[in-house]
Amino acid sequence: CSNISMATKAYEFIKEEPPVLVDWMPWSHVAGGNKAFNLALYNGGTFYIDNGSPNPNDFAKTVKNLTDIGPTWYFNVPKGYELLVTEMSKNTLLAKSFFKRIKLLVYSGASMPNHVFEQMEKLSVEYTGEKIFFSAAYGASETAPMTTMPTHRCNFPGNIGVPQFGTEMKLIPFGDKFEVRLKGPHITPGYWNDEIQTLKSFDKDGFFKIGDALKFQDKSNPDLGFYFDGRLSENFKLNT
């Protein structure tokens, strides 16, 4: 509940208009089973199961579902958005349905290609007259999942925003990067039946060591948010 409360507080429109989601994410994944499903439940919204997926061989189902039902909040991975903007560029019925009441577009899990971000903004202006808020989100299973989100419009992809309400963030210098550690009511208390891993995963102040590095968009203005700067042990993310 704490993670859903954080998101609701960050985006006031959710209270004014109960969210409508059309979502493909498996409920075995914390983003689908907690964030997406409970966002609708917590706010008296409507949750439609998308039986498609961001896979070229399965995306036709998603196209049909989004043509039938336009969401107000939409989440996908970058590959899903790439397939979506390609289809909307030639499918007017899909684009009209998708944009008729959309308020927020969210992606996570990988880097968003610039051309996909720009094409989505172009389509949103074409069908709504304005740029729809299109943002990255950051977190992990242990953070329920989202722990940062942007609160201002970004003109380019990748900004993961600032800590959500109730989240404490600690930044530890790590070479030319900052290791990020997190604390809040949405953070897991530990790993089931694994005391050793639990002890290794928290510092002496109770901050969860997520294992990632971040960098400021602008060090002189932290309110502008952060960018993901790789794992501490590796500096790459898969595209999907």
Question: Can you name each region flagged by the protein language model?
Answer:
Residues 178-238:
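Conserved ATP-binding/catalytic segment of the ANL
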Residues 24-30, 37, 53:
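Conserved AMP-binding
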Residues 5-13, 90, 126, 197:
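Conserved helix-loop functional segments at active or binding sites
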Residues 7, 87-88, 194, 239:
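Residue-level signal for well-ordered alpha-helical positions
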Residues 1, 140-143, 210, 238:
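Ser/Thr-glycine-rich phosphate-binding loops at phosphate-binding pockets of nucleotides
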Residues 1-24, 36-37, 43, 48-177:
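Conserved adenylate-forming
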Residues 28, 54-55, 81, 112, ...:
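Short, glycine-/Ser/Thr-/acidic-enriched flexible segments
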